Swiss-Prot record:
Pathway: Metabolic intermediate biosynthesis; chorismate biosynthesis; chorismate from D-erythrose 4-phosphate and phosphoenolpyruvate: step 4/7
High-level lineage: Bacteria, Bacillati, Bacillota, Bacilli, Bacillales
Annotated protein name in UniProt: Shikimate dehydrogenase (NADP(+))
Family: Belongs to the shikimate dehydrogenase family.
InterPro entries: Aminoacid_DH-like_N_sf, NAD(P)-bd_dom_sf, SDH_C, Shikimate_DH, Shikimate_DH-bd_N, Shikimate_DH_fam, Shikm_DH/Glu-tRNA_Rdtase
Binding site for NADP(+): G127, A128, G129, G130, A131, N151, R152, T153, V154, D155, K156, I219, G242
Originating organism: Bacillus anthracis (strain CDC 684 / NRRL 3495)
Amino acid sequence: MKRLYGVIGNPIGHSLSPVMHNDAFEHLKMDAHYHAFLVKEEVLGEAVRGLKALGISGFNVTTPHKVAIMDYLDEIDPLAKQIGAVNTVVHKDGKLIGYNTDGIGFVRALQSISSEPLQEKRILLLGAGGASRAIYFSLADAGVKEIDVANRTVDKAKELIAACTATVHSVALSLEKATKEQGNYDIIIQTTTIGMHPRVEHTPLQISSLKKGTIVSDIIYNPFETKILCEAKEQGAIIQNGIDMFVYQGALAFEMWTGCVPNIERMKQLVIRKLGG
């Protein structure tokens, strides 16, 4: 019997997840289908109960349901609980279990371009929103010991740092101070929407004095190269856009659902083609 997977969100028509997962199913000769479900906020509970009743094997959760979904699940993974958001649900033994693969997916994506263990790196996170929180907690969970957080509102950065129970040395910075101290970091991670299409001329941090070999990663992938990545490349940095995070978090969800590891490079090239790259 064909297994059913999917993604719920609103809007959902733009999602690249169905293309990516269905290609992986076909490539691995698996009898499965991944579908995008438009689910409005006021019917989220009914939709989740309906998916469970239909016997869906697993599904992703995107905007605006990542927090609200937690009220309708049977179990939540400890890391997802700490992050406060779920983006992947596994249906196992009659239970819906929530996970967060965003942060772990990002960590795996970052490791894929780093020649050295991340645990030894000094990291600067730009932003203190939901994406930053997932990445911060996942980096801490992976054993990274130095993670500073820069945000327009410094108090929000302080709140993010205070919420983490892991042993991490962290300082909350203003964006102005982070700009001055950018040369002290091995990795800079841009987690805000600043620089996303159509406001491509904006950047949260003017890149001017990076040290050699710095990695600059931006979770945005439209455009492929944001202003911060362009400036970092001019400084000789190793750059990474958000496609890697999207692919790795999806691949991790696929692995959780099926027990099979998909071809990451195949997934990545498919997404790039679909985005017109």
